[in-house]
Amino acid sequence: MFAGLPSLTHEQQQKAVERIQELMSQGMSSGQAIALVAEELRANHSGERIVARFEDEDE
């Protein structure tokens, strides 16, 4: 479970995807790009935050 994740609008999510794609087109790995954008979002986000729970369902 992750607490304090930014709650993003669809437009904000789309901009994040575009930023990740831009970084990857410049040679950054997908993992690095995602981590960087996530860090930027957390640092700059001033809106609501959510609690998210991720579970692996390999069964």
UniProtKB/Swiss-Prot annotation:
Signal peptide (from-to): none
One Pfam family named in its UniProt record: UPF0181
InterPro entries reported in the protein's UniProt record: UPF0181
HAMAP family: UPF0181 (MF_00507)
Family: Belongs to the UPF0181 family.
Protein's name in the database: UPF0181 protein YoaH
